[in-house]
Swiss-Prot record:
Belongs to the MsrA Met sulfoxide reductase family. The gene is msrA. Has an important function as a repair enzyme for proteins that have been inactivated by oxidation. Catalyzes the reversible oxidation-reduction of methionine sulfoxide in proteins to methionine. It catalyses: L-methionyl-[protein] + [thioredoxin]-disulfide + H2O = L-methionyl-(S)-S-oxide-[protein] + [thioredoxin]-dithiol; [thioredoxin]-disulfide + L-methionine + H2O = L-methionine (S)-S-oxide + [thioredoxin]-dithiol. The active site is at 10. This is Peptide methionine sulfoxide reductase MsrA. HAMAP family: MsrA. One of its GO terms (biological process) is protein modification process. Its EC number is 1.8.4.11. It holds the Pfam family PMSR. One of its GO terms (molecular function) is peptide-methionine (S)-S-oxide reductase activity. Keywords: Oxidoreductase.
Length: 169
């Protein structure tokens, strides 16, 4: 099994696209990249901990590759916005691919270069690619949010879905 960590704005909106893929064993919402041990949602939202909301994905590389996950990640984000994603603003919502080893870093960097060269976006691709740091699970009420709260999830993801349809379909 392998692990991937992606930050792409509100973690609620990052779970479902990955959970629907064959070879995914788990997708958990949490926080990473900051300087506070095991922060709470309230602490992360205060923008004082340095953490980003992210998802940790455990996957079977014999069924789905890390490269496939990176491609799926791009299609869930606005890679030209370094200051948050969609209606969620601030460092805690910035887009980041966290790599767990050198191979993942190389795949992510190559994929970013390919996306930049594709001309899909007029602006530069600014998503960060950074080494993985400790990942802290978010509170239980954040886990599987789209399943537990479908109406609120639909409202919170509407702007994202509109952007994705315009730029990734």
């Amino acid at each position: 099994m392998e692990r991937a960590i992606f930050a792409g704005g509100c973690f609620w909106c990052m779970v479902q696209p990955f959970e629907e893929q064959a070879g995914i064993l788990s997708v958990r919402s949490g926080y990473t990249g900051g300087h506070v041990h095991n922060p709470s949602y309230e602490q992360v939202c205060s923008k004082t901990t340095g953490h980003t909301e992210a998802v940790e994905i455990i996957f079977d590389p014999s069924l789905i590759s890390y490269s496939d996950l990176v491609e799926l990640y791009w299609a869930q984000t606005d890679p030209t916005d370094a200051f948050g994603q969609f209606e969620d603003r601030g460092d805690n919502y910035r887009p980041v691919i966290y790599y767990t080893d050198e191979r993942q870093r190389e795949i992510a960097e190559r994929s970013k270069q390919t996306l930049q060269a594709s001309g899909r976006f007029d602006q530069p691709i600014v998503t960060s690619i950074e080494p993985a740091e400790p990942f802290y699970l978010a509170e239980d009420y954040h886990q599987g949010f789209y399943q537990k709260n479908p109406e609120r999830y639909a409202q919170s993801s509407a702007i994202r879905h509109q952007f994705l349809e315009e730029h990734w379909q």
